[in-house]
Amino acid sequence: MGQKVHPTGIRLGISKPWVSTWYASSKDFSAQLFGDHKVRTFLTKELKTASVSKIVIERPAKSIRVTIHTARPGVVIGKKGEDVEKLRQAVTKIAGVPAQINISEVRKPELDAQLVADGIASQLERRVMFRRAMKRSVQNAMRIGSKGIKVEVSGRLGGAEIARTEWYREGRVPLHTLRADIDYATSEALTTYGIIGVKVWIFKGEVIGGLPLVQEQEKPAKRAPKKAKKSAK
């Protein structure tokens, strides 16, 4: 059987940026990598209901900067910023260095593979029929402007005795084209029959400018300065 390489891993440095961006000496590398893992695990667990897409970690000069990409920034920030301050204190304690937390809003959650996968998993846990959940997510993505999407679920679908895999695709998903912007994510649904795995591939178009163009597009948009009002004479 043909095996598939990880769509994000093969594009790192070409059209996909890393989610941890820092340099470390050989003696500190493993400790910092494990620290990143602990921070991500903690934040993913704490923000389970906040529709978190990804967590980007940077380590400038004996500190840690965490950027949380979420479709529901209000849930992360909390009332008057109370929740985000608690998260900052917790991350500082876990990482052992001063922490800064930034929030980046995901404008189109229907085109984010992680949010789509988590949404399907959530529906499966609520006993929604898997075909209906898959089809609804695919149709929403295509309506918003996706070039193509593929969704795959595997496990004891519908409580069947024998586990199987089913998938649904619309549009084109060119996995071998390195300039293709493929967003890939996985999730798990914990049902009474066992775990059902969910995989999502979303093709957003081709990136001609390479990694610098992608990084420029991912930066939060700057607000235009307000024009001075003319005084009425």
Curated annotation (Swiss-Prot):
From the record, give the transmembrane residue ranges.
Answer: none
Give a yes or no for keyword Glycoprotein in this entry. no
Which InterPro entries does this chain map to? KH_dom, KH_dom-like_a/b, KH_dom_type_2, KH_sf_prok-type, Ribosomal_S3_C_sf, Ribosomal_uS3_bac-typ, Ribosomal_uS3_C, Ribosomal_uS3_CS
**Cellular component aspect of the GO annotation:** cytosolic small ribosomal subunit
Which GO MF terms are attached to this record?
A: mRNA binding; rRNA binding; structural constituent of ribosome
Which processes are annotated in GO (biological process)? Answer: translation
Assigned keywords, A-Z: Ribonucleoprotein, Ribosomal protein, RNA-binding, rRNA-binding
What region holds the KH type-2 domain?
39-107
Q: Subunit comment for this entry? A: Part of the 30S ribosomal subunit. Forms a tight complex with proteins S10 and S14.
Which protein family is named in the record? Answer: Belongs to the universal ribosomal protein uS3 family.
Q: What does this protein do?
A: Binds the lower part of the 30S subunit head. Binds mRNA in the 70S ribosome, positioning it for translation.
Stated name of the protein: Small ribosomal subunit protein uS3
Q: Origin organism of this chain?
A: Pseudoalteromonas translucida (strain TAC 125)
